């Protein structure tokens, strides 16, 4: 049973993912999938809740097996139950518990990339309302936690306007 709100869970989730990436000597981590996203989940007894999921991607390192061991050791230090699926040469690390519900580190996530992803524990809340709240903040120009480094996606429903740019004043 969690005592965190979904947004507190998001804060812990983002810190967990970013702290995990810091265990590796890899640069270029970014939220390829977008910001932290809320989802519906079950709290038991038919009660619905909400939790966030979040991931970061980076170019693959040169020592996937060593990097998998580093992530596993770090997650164990956080009190997580950890298992390494040793699909040589691209192991995957799975963790449960600790600061998040579950997490995974994939050394072959796609085009020569690493991926660290996690899901926060389910907490009382409404995922749709949270998403609307997050999107309202984004529309107001507020950077929602986890959005740092995301690339805006083209929205065919949105009307884009090109603003005329005033010519620069000549230097002198």
Where are these regions (language model features)?
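An acidic-aromatic pocket/loop used at catalytic or ligand-binding sites
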Residues: 1-19, 85-172
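Compositionally biased P/S/T/G-rich terminal and signal peptide-adjacent segments
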Residues: 8-53, 168-171
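Amphipathic alpha-helical segments
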Residues: 15-24, 62-83
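Short, low-complexity intrinsically disordered segments
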Residues: 27-28, 55, 73, 88, ...
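Surface-exposed patches in mature extracellular/periplasmic domains of secreted proteins
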Residues: 28-33, 80-88
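Short small/polar-residue motifs
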Residues: 39, 76-81, 97-104
